[in-house]
């Protein structure tokens, strides 16, 4: 087992900090103290996806960042995606992924691929990297400790009110039992959650990772929900970054089509989390190295903040 992550483990802290560029390190150290005090003991849910999961430098940087958050007394919980990895695996079996309203259509064969890729390959890679740098990560799916109970999602057909679209084994969260996550946090572990839910009869369901992250933040009463993506944040139709969005403004962006595709479940989940009492919800650019640390430990504004009012 990896060394315990606490103040008595300076080796892990040194490993996590050493790879950060000197200028960035100085900035973080100068600004971090009030944020460390503010968020000490608080839960930070991180939706991990996009280039940050596929580019080697960003992957290693993310692992160090999560460890550093744990070392300074926060409780990071990672919920990961894996769209590109699923697409690649589907290609190998002669299938092409299709999406409806940002949700992956999931037939039986696709569900098997999703389980193997998310609950196996992707999760193990994240856990291995965190442990490699001195952290203690544990991988979970919805089956572990009854974490995520799900049922088949009823996707409303926007063109035919009252009708639904069958998108296969895509899950709608019925309940989250946070006991296993809280137990891991209490023992200084970092939970890494694959977005796969299970019904009472054992049927696996593919659940959008943004949806799982938002619901997990709500149930855990998280201080922050940070969603990492491949764009600077929410953009308007001219490509300008919208740094702050209220619930009313989000509804307008939904209505005029500015927010569409894969951003639909992301923004909906972010807004639901904010309305549920998560104090701070941010969508940030995961392509920027150490963007997670910069968002949490410095005054530097990143991405888009989602507000419930």
UniProtKB/Swiss-Prot annotation:
- Gene Ontology molecular-function annotations: acetylglutamate kinase activity; ATP binding
Q: What is its main location?
A: cytoplasm
Q: Which GO terms describe its biological process?
A: arginine biosynthetic process via ornithine; L-arginine biosynthetic process
Recorded superkingdom? Bacteria
Where is this chain's protein located in or outside the cell?
Cytoplasm
According to UniProt, the reaction catalysed is:
N-acetyl-L-glutamate + ATP = N-acetyl-L-glutamyl 5-phosphate + ADP
Annotated pathway: Amino-acid biosynthesis; L-arginine biosynthesis; N(2)-acetyl-L-ornithine from L-glutamate: step 2/4
Q: Write out the residues that bind substrate.
A: 82-83, 104, 206
- Is-annotated flag, keyword ATP-binding? yes
Per the UniProt entry, the Enzyme Commission number(s) are: 2.7.2.8
Q: In this UniProt entry, which residues are annotated as the site Transition state stabilizer?
A: 47, 266
InterPro entries linked: AceGlu_kinase-like_sf (IPR036393), AcgluKinase_fam (IPR004662), ArgB (IPR037528), Asp/Glu/Uridylate_kinase (IPR001048), NAGK-C (IPR041727)
What keyword terms does UniProt attach to this protein? Amino-acid biosynthesis, Arginine biosynthesis, ATP-binding, Cytoplasm, Kinase, Nucleotide-binding, Transferase
Output the Gene Ontology cellular-component terms.
Answer: cytoplasm
Family note: Belongs to the acetylglutamate kinase family. ArgB subfamily.
Q: What does this protein do?
A: Catalyzes the ATP-dependent phosphorylation of N-acetyl-L-glutamate.
Recorded protein name is Acetylglutamate kinase
